[in-house]
Amino acid sequence: MTQTKKIYISDVTLRDGSHAIRHQYSVEQARQIAQALDEARVDSIEVAHGDGLQGSSFNYGFGAHTDLEWIEAVASVVKHAKITTLLLPGIGTVHDLKAAYEAGVRVVRVATHCTEADVSRQHIEYARQLGMEAVGFLMMSHMTSPKALAEQAKLMESYGATCCYVVDSGGALGMNDVRDRFRAFKDILKPETQTGMHAHHNLSLGVANSIVAVEEGCDRVDASLAGMGAGAGNAPLEVFIAAAERLGWNHGTDLYKLMDAADDIVRPLQDRPVRVDRETLALGYAGVYSSFLRHSEAAAAKYGLKAVDILVELGKRRMVGGQEDMIVDVALDLLRQREAASL
């Protein structure tokens, strides 16, 4: 990568970060965080329930506000950054996408499991019809090979996505894993199609993996203030920017404003520290969807189990995003096994 190439900085504090506090951002908190990010000159600010448009539900957890209330609050203060949102086909609809567009969203990341890009077609095509920028977002990218992942990205590109993401939802990718996936993308995607990296910090590799991605030609990097996100969080934005600064990379943001926002605004909101610990490390080790953390901890407390045991079993069963309802089933299975062993 040349030093002159501008890295697109995509903040996810107000979407992925929502997982860390069970989707309970107040409208005022969303407004305050967005204003701080905008003043620090990030390129985009993603806003939604942690599980995307219409994610507020029994399965994922109910948000303190609707997506539109959060989006409108952010739109009222943002002057520079593009307002972005996330949509999972089958949860969010084209009607939700249109409403988000009318509220101020200009970029949508259409997210599917890493082997299911074909379900993104309707939403990517509709976003382009609205005049939005459509981005393909391949979750749990560690669960398929680099070549197969690139083929899925190619599908999204064919539907109209102008950028395709490697999404390490489980925080399970190593640096060579990231390198291999971006090289596979480069081999198959059009030169004009951008690529992005969405890292999680469960193995403490969020920043390192993002750096490797940029070294391999990645155009966009997701990160969040104080790492606010599911599991051990995303790549901490202020840390990535500091590292990029030392490497002489062009990121276009104000490091000190990001540091202040991380410590003064975001970190105090964490009711559970966003960090690598026993449970979040288990996510990366077992390759489990990072947003399963809080659900698994709740199930463990309810049934007198260890959250780590639940998470490792979820990894063995290769559970993916959207199967949150199975966490209780796994807990009950473990409880039955424990009771049988004690007889």
Swiss-Prot record:
Coiled-coil region: none
GO molecular function: 2-isopropylmalate synthase activity; 4-hydroxy-2-oxovalerate aldolase activity; manganese ion binding
Top-level taxon in the UniProt lineage: Bacteria
Catalyzed reaction equations: (S)-4-hydroxy-2-oxopentanoate = acetaldehyde + pyruvate
Keywords noted in UniProt: Aromatic hydrocarbons catabolism, Lyase, Manganese, Metal-binding
CDD domains in the record: DRE_TIM_HOA (cd07943)
Domain Pyruvate carboxyltransferase intervals: 7-259
Top-level EC class: lyase
Positions annotated to bind substrate: 15-16, 169, 198, 289
Pfam families found in the cross-reference section: DmpG_comm (PF07836), HMGL-like (PF00682)
A Gene Ontology BP annotation from the UniProt entry: L-leucine biosynthetic process
Catalytic residues, chain numbering: 19
SUPFAM superfamilies attached to this UniProt entry: Aldolase, post-HMGL domain-like
InterPro entries assigned: 2-IPM_HCS-like (IPR050073), 4OH_2_O-val_aldolase (IPR017629), Aldolase_TIM (IPR013785), DmpG_comm (IPR012425), DRE_TIM_HOA (IPR035685), PYR_CT (IPR000891)
Residues reported to bind Mn(2+): 16, 198, 200
Site (Transition state stabilizer): 15
Keyword Lyase among UniProt keywords: yes
Presence of keyword Manganese: yes
EC code: 4.1.3.39
HAMAP family (UniProt xref): HOA
Family: Belongs to the 4-hydroxy-2-oxovalerate aldolase family.
Protein name: 4-hydroxy-2-oxovalerate aldolase 1
